[in-house]
Amino acid sequence: MLSSTDFTFASWELVVRVDHPNEEQQKDVTLRVSGDLHVGGVMLKLVEQINISQDWSDFALWWEQKHCWLLKTHWTLDKYGVQADAKLLFTPQHKMLRLRLPNLKMVRLRVSFSAVVFKAVSDICKILNIRRSEELSLLKPSGDYFKKKKKKDKNNKEPIIEDILNLESSPTASGSSVSPGLYSKTMTPIYDPINGTPASSTMTWFSDSPLTEQNCSILAFSQPPQSPEALADMYQPRSLVDKAKLNAGWLDSSRSLMEQGIQEDEQLLLRFKYYSFFDLNPKYDAVRINQLYEQARWAILLEEIDCTEEEMLIFAALQYHISKLSLSAETQDFAGESEVDEIEAALSNLEVTLEGGKADSLLEDITDIPKLADNLKLFRPKKLLPKAFKQYWFIFKDTSIAYFKNKELEQGEPLEKLNLRGCEVVPDVNVAGRKFGIKLLIPVADGMNEMYLRCDHENQYAQWMAACMLASKGKTMADSSYQPEVLNILSFLRMKNRNSASQVASSLENMDMNPECFVSPRCAKRHKSKQLAARILEAHQNVAQMPLVEAKLRFIQAWQSLPEFGLTYYLVRFKGSKKDDILGVSYNRLIKIDAATGIPVTTWRFTNIKQWNVNWETRQVVIEFDQNVFTAFTCLSADCKIVHEYIGGYIFLSTRSKDQNETLDEDLFHKLTGGQD
């Protein structure tokens, strides 16, 4: 047993700075400790010496030199390696953070700076009533995001006049679980599936929620369109390299905010990171659908994703329609909403979920192998040869497409048979010009084979396009998503149909919004305001009867149909190469893209990946595929951990199923994305 003299010799002084909640400046507290004292004992000594009566349960020790939290309170100082020269800070784990949402609304709320980002985002989404938090993450804005503001404010501070939604009361400073917001007793938020208004019955159960009914409407309804001047002031990427810069700031999901240098009250962006949207349901996802619509809208307006002028006008018409409905008194009048019975809503949702198949057609679906057979025109690009289409007899079965010289030779050997699994499917459509084409980029050993198919009419195009899209994902036309995909394509084509000039002329005088607000600045420059308004109203005739939530879902579906949808770009250099390339990361594949031309060079599917890892010394990502195929690259526009996490994150999301509840296997996520640092 140690005497007091021996203890004094074995002990040492430890200086801890304390974040006093009611004082602006931090104060140092000196403790006498020994190496076998556990962290919980250090905190107990601190609280006793501070001698202020308050709840200290949210406080923890932060080790500045090691940049880590000392959260294992049963560990001793010796086990952590803490010595007398350690700089420790006794500080709250929950701090204020400003988040810019996809609809550009700023919210200020209390967030855990000690939990890993994956968990912090989950808590944030519970406060904001956004299901499937695994699809979102936090992005640190690049300097380009603030480039216009720098001219006005060198410190990059937000304008004082900005209206910030303050949710400071959640979660509590003591670190208790987050408020359930507008969630019902089963933690399921309920909204009107037509206009997205929250069901009033859930509001009475949680009157202390920081997300009041008024605040919920701010998050569930589209914000008024920005002026053309404000649009012009926003950063717009002009090349794939510029787009790659947008994705450099994703935070590491396996580390805490504090560990990544995020300061209290700093501004971060909350964004949908993974373009794999699971189980979107208007009854429960009004906020999620609106924020997803807003992220898609800004991607179109700022040209973060390419689209044709015809498609831009469709998006503009939908925006105009959504803006009108969002501003109308009907949609914002909550008082007249009837209460939604939770059990009825759950049963109704179950009916919708199970509606896909009927019992009498089940046997037919199992035994029948769907097949498409028709005359299509084919063109294969060759250097120095003009673009000439030639007609062949095509058969589409399973995930393969074969073609013959004519129908009579169908029973013989095809001229060529191609498996479309893993191919790129790009629409090549001009409805006004009656052009319905499909561009296929089929991966081969040395790159990509390019071919074009030309259909005669909308129905033929919708059937073959849907079949190609499913085959690229490894699915056949027997899949339940085939017919809905055909209908979605037809719906999008009908939105592009031109309407009579008389209808447009009568509406032109009633357009009470600036048409330049609904298109990208470059598109606006190509048209006079009146001409642009006429074309938007012309397209609007096809969507004028849509309810609000349906219009948002149509916008999201149209966004998903764009060739570049779901691709996140990074500037990389492949092993053995002397030039930089672009790596596109999608929900099911990686694409090597020529940085100069934007043309895909090689595609690798996630289903063919055997393993992937990071060489942390060389900062190189190494991927092994089937058949002993390897590729390796270094990331130039971002940390290699970000790309590593993207691959693992998408593979993690592919494990979700509707049979599961909404509880995620967080350990599996970190196993797939964490790497070994």
From Swiss-Prot:
One Pfam family here: FERM_M
Membrane topology label: Peripheral membrane protein
Expression by tissue: Expressed in brain, skeletal muscle, kidney, colon, adrenal gland, prostate, and placenta. Weakly or not expressed in heart, thymus, spleen, liver, small intestine, bone marrow, lung and peripheral blood leukocytes. Overexpressed in some colon and lung tumors. In skin, it is localized within the epidermis and particularly in basal keratocytes. Not detected in epidermal melanocytes and dermal fibroblasts.
The record's InterPro entries line, in alphabetical order, gives:
Band_41_domain, FERM_2, FERM_central, Kindlin/fermitin, Kindlin_2_N, PH-like_dom_sf, PH_domain, PH_Kindlin/fermitin
Q: Which GO terms describe its biological process?
A: basement membrane organization; cell adhesion; cell-matrix adhesion; establishment of epithelial cell polarity; integrin-mediated signaling pathway; keratinocyte migration; keratinocyte proliferation; negative regulation of canonical Wnt signaling pathway
GO CC, sorted alphabetically, is: cell junction; cell periphery; cytoplasm; cytoskeleton; cytosol; focal adhesion; ruffle membrane
Q: Which residues form the FERM domain?
A: 96-653
Query: Localized where?
Result: Cytoplasm, Cytoskeleton; Cell junction, Focal adhesion; Cell projection, Ruffle membrane
Q: Which residues carry this modification: Phosphoserine?
A: 170, 179, 361
Provide this UniProt record's keywords sorted from A to Z.
Cell adhesion, Cell junction, Cell membrane, Cell projection, Cytoplasm, Cytoskeleton, Disease variant, Membrane, Phosphoprotein
Q: What factors induce this protein?
A: By TGFB1.
**In Gene Ontology terms, what is one molecular function of this protein?**
actin filament binding
SUPFAM superfamilies, alphabetically?
PH domain-like, Second domain of FERM
Free-text note regarding domains:
The FERM domain is not correctly detected by PROSITE or Pfam techniques because it contains the insertion of a PH domain. The FERM domain contains the subdomains F1, F2 and F3. It is preceded by a F0 domain with a ubiquitin-like fold. The F0 domain is required for integrin activation and for localization at focal adhesions.
Query: Which PANTHER family does the record associate with it?
Result: FERMITIN 2-RELATED (PTHR16160), FERMITIN FAMILY HOMOLOG 1 (PTHR16160:SF12)
> Implicated in which disease?
Kindler syndrome: An autosomal recessive skin disorder characterized by skin blistering, photosensitivity, progressive poikiloderma, and extensive skin atrophy. Additional clinical features include gingival erosions, ocular, esophageal, gastrointestinal and urogenital involvement, and an increased risk of mucocutaneous malignancy.
Q: What is the designated name of this protein?
A: Fermitin family homolog 1
Q: Which organism is it from?
A: Homo sapiens (Human)
